[in-house]
Amino acid sequence: MTKFLGPIAGFGVTFSTMFKKSNTEFYPEEKVPTAPRYHGRHQLNRYADGLEKCIGCELCAWACPADAIYVEGADNTDEERFSPGERYGQVYQINYLRCIGCGLCIEACPTRALTMTNEYEMADDNRAGLIYEKDRLLAPLEPGMVESPHPMAPGATAEDYYRGTVTGGAAAAAQDESEVDDTAGDRP
């Protein structure tokens, strides 16, 4: 008798679950929003005027336990200013084949230049495509921002940038002012 009831009990479980609502998420077609603090792709942030926040200190690379970050710092000049400080990150790479998404690089950054976005779709069929260079990591320009290199806002110091008191309109005015100065020398 137990030989007969065993398979029926198994089919009973199958039949009872056949008519329940499934928990399947139809991922590529229906994307579920991520949590606000999700650790996704990294992003190099900018100040309100478009200058980069990265100062090329390499603390993020030193903090990375997977050795996934490579940074080369370079000195800013008055002609080519990429960040308000003395230095900027000339070369910045993150190897997502090695990155474990721990966020230690974010905690190590003294200027909050590096943050993580909610973007998680980074799959690629090419290994070289998973090494993100600076151009793919930089935050996009927002209205009022000017592409670096450009001079600091008139009268602003590095401390003003650090405290967040520099606005995007000040940089646009500085850029317009420098363009006027450049064309003034061409007149007879």
Swiss-Prot record:
Keyword Translocase: yes
Residues that bind [4Fe-4S] cluster 1: C54, C57, C60, C109
Record's cofactor remark: Binds 2 [4Fe-4S] clusters per subunit.
Keywords linked to the UniProt accession: 4Fe-4S, Cell membrane, Iron, Iron-sulfur, Membrane, Metal-binding, NAD, Quinone, Repeat, Translocase, Ubiquinone
Compartment list: Cell membrane
Residue ranges of the region described as Disordered: 167-188
Matches recorded under InterPro entries: 4Fe4S_Fe-S-bd, 4Fe4S_Fe_S_CS, NADH_quinone_OxRdtase_chainI
Chain sites annotated for binding [4Fe-4S] cluster 2: C64, C99, C102, C105
Single GO cellular component term: plasma membrane
Listed Acidic residues bias regions: 176-188
Major enzyme class: translocase
Domain 4Fe-4S ferredoxin-type: 44-74, 90-119
Obligatory cofactor(s): [4Fe-4S] cluster
Listed GO biological process terms: aerobic respiration
Alphabetized GO MF terms: 4 iron, 4 sulfur cluster binding; iron ion binding; NADH:ubiquinone reductase (non-electrogenic) activity; quinone binding
Family: Belongs to the complex I 23 kDa subunit family.
Chain's role: NDH-1 shuttles electrons from NADH, via FMN and iron-sulfur (Fe-S) centers, to quinones in the respiratory chain. The immediate electron acceptor for the enzyme in this species is believed to be ubiquinone. Couples the redox reaction to proton translocation (for every two electrons transferred, four hydrogen ions are translocated across the cytoplasmic membrane), and thus conserves the redox energy in a proton gradient.
Subunit note: NDH-1 is composed of 14 different subunits. Subunits NuoA, H, J, K, L, M, N constitute the membrane sector of the complex.
UniProt name for this protein: NADH-quinone oxidoreductase subunit I
Species of the source: Rhodococcus jostii (strain RHA1)
The organism's taxonomic lineage, starting at the top: Bacteria, Bacillati, Actinomycetota, Actinomycetes, Mycobacteriales
Gene: nuoI
